[in-house]
Amino acid sequence: MSGHRKRVYPQSQFQYANSVPAAGQAAAPGYPPVAGMPQADYSQQAQPQAQPAFLTPAQQQLHQQIDQAVQGVGNMQLHNVPVVDPNGFYQQQPPVTTPGAVPSGAVPQMQQQYAQPAAIGKAMNQLYPIDLLTELPPPISDLSLPPPPLMVPPEKFVVPSETANAPPDFLRCTLNALPKSNSLLKKSKLPLALVIRPYQCLSDSQNPIPLTSDGXXVRCRRCRSYINPFVTFVEGGRRWRCNFCNLANDVPMAFDMSTQGVPTNRYERNEVQHSVVEYLAPREYAVRAPPPSVYSFILDVSQNAIKNGLLATAARTLLETLDTLPNHDDRTRISILAVDNSIHYFSIPTDEEGDHIKMLDVVDLDEPFLPMPDSLFVSLSECRSNLEKLLSQLPEIFQYNIMNKFALGPALKAAHNLIKRIGGKIIVVSSTLPNIGVGKLSKRNEAGVANTSKEASQLLSVQDSFYKNFTIDCNKTQVTIDLFLASDDYMDVASLSNLARYTSGQTHFYPGWSAAKLTDVTKFTKEFSKHLSMDLSMEAVMRARGSSGLRMSRFYGHFFNRSSDLCAFPTFPRDQSYVFEVNLDEQIVRDYAYLQVAVLLSSNTAQRRIRVITICIPTTESLPEVYASADQLAITAYFAQKAIEKVFSSGFEDAREFLNKSVQDILATYKKDIVVSNTAGGAPLRLCANLRMFPLLMHSLTKHMAFRNGIVPSDHRAAALNNLESMPLPYLIKNIYATVYSLHDMPDEAGLQNENGEVVLPEPINATSSLLERYGLYLIDNASELFLWIGGDAVNELTMDVFGTPEILQIPIGKNELPVLENSEFNARVRNIISKIREHSDIITYQSLYIVMGASLSEPVNHASAREVATLRLWATSTLVEDKVL
């Protein structure tokens, strides 16, 4: 490979996006100086940032207009920040605090009294106005920027540290400066909501957070918030004042003692140093001992599942995953139900009792019973050999099955009866529409209804109330349902997905799946295996709290809303995200507000744990400061949830109209209340720099499969809506606005490992077909699939280096893997990039690769794969959301 001569492929003669200034080149001013504890001096005021030495004519005109506006309306305090380069807006700013060493036993003297006002002129994010019409093409590098920083001075922390405010990966607010009044919030037209992801990895052993294991979970006796880095100790440290409700609470003696009774320094405790902490919960937080991990598998053994190979693939994958199934304490239990027009139980003895496995058939679907309850639900450790034997023989047992019925409803009730005393997961693997017994479904007539005002009500509604009512029973008994649906026929994802939605589960949809396709098998086995290996936490509840004036009002995600503010999770997933809408019920009088999320659950290590996440957010009476601190990605996530809600309540047209109107309202408010003068000689479209990608994201959302106009199969539409409901924020943004890499002209280091052993990815380009050269090679990543686009006029050298064939018409299009070419370094680099993109430790998704050939003038009109090529092109180009195609 080292002797391979590097090829130079054709490249564009004009760099389309090079003229766009990089976002975030200068840190925003306004930070107080950082000093060590406890002699910190926070009185120094922020200094104005110097003007840039060179300005473009547009920037000079913009500066003159803003200067005139500031002079003319200075008393109105509309612009109370220094003017800087509008293209130098917020970037990852240096922390406002640095870790300070606290002498052992010493009490920091830098805390203010709870109600003491902040210093006049506190540092806030600054408003950097831009003209959207001059920001073309949109600077997509902004999508990878962090949100505007939380401007919290060190004196607000018990112990200043970089971890004293929760990182945005766990908890981020749509507004990082909260309006003090509801009238100001309404005036802004910006939403106030939280995007929550309490767990960042599929396994708790990856990137663990600080754990407090002494059993002392200190909480406010009035509002029940947990002690956190923003409380104050008063009365000589004997009491602590709650930052949520202002109540002074006694500090328990155990707070200053180790588990061995040795005095310790309270300022070294995790809960006052970190805003993301976990507790080993004391006994009063559990109504029973933590249950074991429980899995009940419902396997479709009907004719469809035999023919397409799903049963054999699922059984083999489960067999290979037994070693990685969570079983830390050897208490994990398993049951297997095979289902067609009957329910087939398997009585599995322990390995010591022998290897005779009995299959017990129950044909009464109206009243399914448990023939031998004690041996149908067995220990993984004690029955390991017999479980392996059963899974190996399962495809053979049903290989000649000709039944085309699938009794999912009765099977769900049977599995629920098996595990309801303990709780756990019911995992359904099916390729057949439930067509017998309770919950029977039928194929809907999509002709004449798709792409009409009746589409949502007739194609996406639940056919049978069983799929909602049954979830109530599951929540009472701590049972989650996960679905793996793989078929080339209609599955009614809209009805079935309710089972997962209201039990904190997930629906995984594999349209057109067949075990005859290696790529289909690879995707299913990798995702099914990762799902089974994910840590299982049971009996979970999550609650969010706000300081005075803040209240959680609406909740979005996969869970069961048990009360006005308590979300219940029979099992807590590691690969989902949630959105909570926040109401401003009363005037906020303080300079800082607080939000806290707590998750209580039973881990699969037989421990009851509490994860607490707290953030401190400055408050303001200034509309420009509210806009300057708006988080465009979190706002997009919120509007996506509201649009999904709108689909089910009033249809797709109203959902698209809602998204468009939301953007129009924000632009109109900014123009009316923040832009202070008109611009001569043009009609600029003004917005602040930290929101400049927001209109594009919302426009892209209207083109998403979940919302776009046109005929979309209802199963695909329902699956897209289901994914948007629960997708973690980074993947949600990528699913809305795909990442496009240009590979034929990528830098020399791209596709190779850097000094840290990480594969270097090329810089993304804008998602528009105007940038796709007819001779180029591009990779499109939308978080669900990967598209490798080869231009129709690509030179033979490029196709030879990538695919091993000089003829472009011989390239294997469709769902395929890139061939391994031993003598092509370029092929290895492209494969490295694909592998890097597929690496995920926080979600189970494995992205299939689709090879797409672009149009060419020399392309035969009626070649054999013309229809498939056209379909693939349309699908791939639908991700290029900057085009006016859809």
UniProtKB/Swiss-Prot annotation:
Question: According to Swiss-Prot or TrEMBL, what is its membrane topology?
Answer: Peripheral membrane protein
Where would you find this protein in the cell? Cytoplasm; Cytoplasmic vesicle, COPII-coated vesicle membrane; Endoplasmic reticulum membrane; Golgi apparatus membrane
**Pfam families linked to this entry:** Gelsolin, Sec23_BS, Sec23_helical, Sec23_trunk, zf-Sec23_Sec24
| Residues at which Zn(2+) binds | 220, 223, 242, 245
Q: Entry's SUPFAM superfamilies?
A: beta-sandwich domain of Sec23/24, C-terminal, gelsolin-like domain of Sec23/24, Helical domain of Sec23/24, vWA-like, Zn-finger domain of Sec23/24
Query: Which keywords does UniProt give here?
Result: Cytoplasm, Cytoplasmic vesicle, Endoplasmic reticulum, ER-Golgi transport, Golgi apparatus, Membrane, Metal-binding, Protein transport, Transport, Zinc
Could you tell me the Gene Ontology terms of the biological process aspect for this record?
Answer: COPII-coated vesicle cargo loading; intracellular protein transport
What does the record give under GO molecular function?
SNARE binding; zinc ion binding
The annotated region (Disordered) lies at 31-51
Tell me the segments the record calls region Zinc finger-like.
Answer: 220-245
Metal-binding keyword on record: yes
Transcription among the record's keywords? no
Any Gene Ontology CC annotation: endoplasmic reticulum membrane
Covalent S-S links between cysteines: none
What function does the entry list?
Component of the coat protein complex II (COPII) which promotes the formation of transport vesicles from the endoplasmic reticulum (ER). The coat has two main functions, the physical deformation of the endoplasmic reticulum membrane into vesicles and the selection of cargo molecules.
| Subunit structure of this chain's protein | The COPII coat is composed of at least 5 proteins: the SEC23/24 complex, the SEC13/31 complex, and the protein SAR1. Golgi apparatus membrane; Peripheral membrane protein; Cytoplasmic side.
Family recorded in the similarity comment: Belongs to the SEC23/SEC24 family. SEC24 subfamily.
In its UniProt entry, what is this protein called?
Answer: Protein transport protein SEC24
- Species per Swiss-Prot/TrEMBL record: Lachancea kluyveri (strain ATCC 58438 / CBS 3082 / BCRC 21498 / NBRC 1685 / JCM 7257 / NCYC 543 / NRRL Y-12651)
